[in-house]
């Protein structure tokens, strides 16, 4: 419909809507009367469209109106507030682009309104007194970003690193003196006091250019593999220090790259140069809630994919750091610390071990710091992620002291995960003046409908007042934000993204966010994770195959007996297998896949179906939604008489065996299907494609970006059962007629993964962000300082009081059980006290100071 319209971005709805209303005045009067007839209310998009269609009797007129400009506006409206005689619309014409208008239902007059005015309108439905109070708390973070360049095109959202390089090139271009900020930044580079790249003798841009020219001419005359040590003394004579490269060739490339930047900066050279700058050696990653460990933790409360993500992330980042440091010609040992909570009651895990090496790394560790009760004792038991907020400020201070001790100084980059980790990362990055990145994983505001305006109803259980406040602080404090997909940031044409939902919203009685976060901010970046390629590798790599697991997998797939681990059987084991693996809930839609299969006779004749999901017995589950889905699975198997064609296996947590299971499915020339109603990213899609399985995945969410439909896999519409079943059946029919087609899709899927979805690509991109944004923040120092003061005030007057008002759930549980901590229950890292500099002692003292009391 949108393609038929001549609506331009420059035309505001407030300007164009009146003419459109006049052209269909009679019909729209009827429509708006229907809107206001039931009094004050909030209408969602579907309700708006239904009321519009009900107000039109003539079929031709209805089609004309719905397909026209007014229909387009209403179709693009995410919600509307009805306060008779007015209806206020929140219209989203494109990802990230919102406009608010108010229409009088009697005379159809239209008035453009601000986000703040719209939110006040909306608040009237929930707390009229607060909405009318001129002194209600209103926050506008966008007002402090007016001088910061922003993206303008929806298609550019998520490409922050690329555009920051363009902005920096523009700002530094022109006169030589405009390069002074870059020179000043290079002069700050050091590792434990040892200068890197240049020393203080180079104090002007012209001196730097001369030194670069002399050095480049010199190394050009050397054999390209000449080690740096052979010519280090000559470099120092010109004011150049270590960090340019490990060989003559590498040094020449870096010297030339900086010379090009100084001569005429362009985004490509700018990005390339900062990828080589030796600015990141020590990284701290926060993941606080749940049971963070390397074994026996998955499935425990608040513990899941985030743990797997971070452990894979750490391995990839350490490997990339080691390679960079070597290529920079440095002899430096990098360190990565994953900060999480120490839990004395560890439930058989290692969550009571203070310092634990990360497996398959050399210099990375998990550092666990305990929560403290109000009387200063270690909190023994797990605390829900929703009840964690009163502990975080003290946790940040205790963590800071530990970090400075172990790293013997400040980290170079801090990355937060989820609300709690992001808030603590914000506190420490501000305190230590360190570059900060954040990763949401999930934003709870988008999971619970109307959880902002109805926060009071949910606050006792979820404490969204604290959580949403913390999210706003960390989003706006962060130097860069890492996301997995475009849709996570800005959604699709029809649906806002998770971050976009935080653009303008209100929590009546608490706070109104006239601007929360703008998805056009260049801090947003897409860096998709990969799958662990030591586990998920192609089925064709026979020498790596885990053949000792094949008897177990054969039993899992083909044994005829029902057990507590699997039910159903496959009568014809020569058929290819359709495979799926996910949680057993409504959104993951495993029962939907079973229905697609059951309804399609052709598909059933061609292939078997194997699903790995949830529990098999509803009496063993405590999750209401899972119980419903278990019962539905049994009903579908009976209704479609799937005996002999389906195998249902309960959830599997052994990642190594799961990797070989994918490959065994590929051996049957089968396919993987991800049928979710919505999937934010789709890690199982990456895993399956890594193993060489042709993959069908939902077109709702991240998988639509991972797969190029019809080339590297296939999109399926999870709402259209018949269409989805036909699409899968057609693929297998084509493979039956032309066996090479299966190989073609499998190979294209592997190529897609290698080009876009590996941890190597991820680590390279994130470290480039850390290096580039470190300089970017120095270019915008004054604007950042103003915003940081604003955020500090907001933290102190809002978040602190909300967290203080929360009951400390963990403290209450501790009082009900036992007090004190048995020393033998906590494994403490042996102390190796190292001499501290005076500055380190000062920083450590500061890190350990108690939080000020707020009345």
UniProtKB/Swiss-Prot annotation:
GO cellular component: a single term: membrane
Cited InterPro entries: Glyco_trans_1, Sucrose_synth_GT-B1, Sucrose_synthase_pln/cyn, SUS_EPBD, SUS_N
The record's family statement is: Belongs to the glycosyltransferase 1 family. Plant sucrose synthase subfamily.
In UniProt terms, what function does this protein have? Sucrose-cleaving enzyme that provides UDP-glucose and fructose for various metabolic pathways.
User: What Gene3D superfamilies does this protein map onto?
Assistant: 1.20.120.1230, 3.10.450.330, Glycogen Phosphorylase B
Protein's UniProt name:
Sucrose synthase 5
Cite the GO molecular-function annotations of the record.
sucrose synthase activity
Region: GT-B glycosyltransferase, residue numbers:
279-758
This protein's encoding gene: SUS5
Which GO biological-process labels does this protein carry?
Answer: sucrose metabolic process
Q: Note whether Endoplasmic reticulum occurs among the keywords.
A: no
Q: Which UniProt keywords apply?
A: Cytoplasm, Glycosyltransferase, Membrane, Transferase
Name the chemical reaction catalysed here.
an NDP-alpha-D-glucose + D-fructose = a ribonucleoside 5'-diphosphate + sucrose + H(+)
The record's subcellular locations are: Cytoplasm; Membrane
